[in-house]
């Protein structure tokens, strides 16, 4: 059987009914405008009546049993009809039902009938429950309850369309099983019963009466005939559309140019023509229009048909839909614009392609507009419209591209869709896996992997995979395998059948682990599998049952079932237990059904208990790899084309001494040697001087420590600033040994001079950068550190910030009590070297930017 590509699948959900909001908004949307005051008023009245409609529906739902009971008692005699009503137990309140009237005699029936205001339908006779039968009674009570439910649905959505769609045509169906006259009597009884429930609310009574009248009228009306799609060629499909689909679908507003219309209405019709031909309102979007042709069609000099012809021949249409497209795509778009549909067949495409090739755009437009199809659908006055789903029956062939042609983005698609599809119809597909992405996928490419959303499956269940056997072959991939003993000599595969013995038991268990799990279990996993091993060692189970037990273990389930979707899991398990990939869709569908109905364990049993497993492996053979896909086989084969020539001449390396391997082969100059000696980090790290206080420091050494502290904290020598004797007292205490270097640094950081120089002029983020530079000898590490110190600054102030830096664990470990802080990262490697280097190279008083901002820089846009 030859398999060819199909047109793809675009799922379309049929609209089941109309609602007041949808119909109001849909008209404005199709006309590309805002809602008018009258439409807004209609929506407002619907919204205001929403509470009342919900109350009506709630009352009907609460009293539904009584309403159905009253209707059934009018038409059934000889028992209690309500007992045949199938409803959930909690939805029927028996105590609220008037049981006195559940049994009626013939005299009471006719007395009640003739006391009604409505006339009795001709041919009505009360129905005896015993003769009617319990099965028909249940169906009749179900139908009465169905009528009442749909009444509540229609009242809630505010449109009786759902009643017309679902009730029209039921008369013929009920006539074959029951009595039409009895149904009408029951509906009228339900109407009167419901109206009595709302006797105190005239508005609610009017709504219920209106919708019940629709139910009765639609039931009495004859069913409508199907809509026939007109066909003008023998190569086109004959199509019919049920009237219910047409009634429930969104109404396609049709515009017809009449002489007695107002100017505003004529302008709206002209704009509808623009939207159809140019796929947009060119007056609103681009302020373009064909003024001369508009005037002529308004005064009646030309018909709407000729106006459409003029639009198709205009320079704007040529520029938008002809010059930048191939002739194939021009024909497809012209069908959408002038006939409202897509191309039906290759013969139709060839006909119009020849016209556009010989006569150009004008000839194509004339042929389409002069066609009988155009005259039948649009005539002289109607603007063409899209004949989409619901408007008329759609062809099954070309479904995907047909629906895509109706999309707004169709004009942006340059590639012709229909002719490409017609070519694919005639090109057979090669054999491929039905779930694969390519023609010959890997054995591990599982599941429904499709290249396009609208082309979900190019193949059917008869397409099968290409498999290359490795070991015992089968004559036909679709037939059952032959027994292994039919092949005594297997040249392509050296098969060893391992039979159970005491010496080989452990080897068999390890081989089963490798085959089933793909690896040896871990120690803790083996403890869980120990009972299965013991059963096999005690010869209580065969190799087949050992494979079954391992496959049903939690370890196997965790490896090949839980992490994947069903199709992928089936492929994994199938390869592990049967030694080959699945043949095709028919086989994998069977396993999919087993998994859906019975679950994981049923799938394992179905594979191991299969006839193929029994004939190939039996009870004493461990499963092995039997089949491969061609691509998998090529991956595991060392091909000659992949082996370069130089690899064939490789000689084993000769061991050499380390000194010989490190010997310089080229001649190096003196400058080259100096350059290599000086490469790497600079000498700054080695040249760093650390000032520390010791017990035997001299007076001059203490002075150097004080000056180094000033330079580190204030970034300069502050001798000119000591005139005010601000630091005289702390210097005296430091010389006397009462203050350590750490305490001296802390006093400097908490001084008024430091506050004036490094706190007041800057934001908190800059203060934190300078603080870590002065007291820790580095830049801030990250945003987390900045947030921490920012919180301290904001809540406790500068002194607490300096104290937290100096008392930090980092300061104590690196500087202790006797070392003046210094630049800690003058060279690489260091995590904060780049920021520290920038921080030390910049002049603090000349550059105020923040090194590590917590937000990105933004540019002010000039207005």
UniProtKB/Swiss-Prot annotation:
The gene is apcE. Keywords: Antenna complex, Bile pigment, Chloroplast, Chromophore, Electron transport, Lyase, Membrane, Photosynthesis, Phycobilisome, Plastid, Repeat, Thylakoid, Transport. InterPro entries: Globin-like_sf, PBS_linker_dom, PBS_linker_sf, Phycobilisome_asu/bsu, Phycobilisome_asu/bsu_sf. Contains one covalently linked bilin chromophore. This protein autochromophorylates (Potential). One of its GO terms (molecular function) is lyase activity. It comes from Galdieria sulphuraria. Signal peptide: none annotated. This is Phycobiliprotein ApcE. (2R,3E)-phycocyanobilin binds at residue 178. Its main location: plastid.
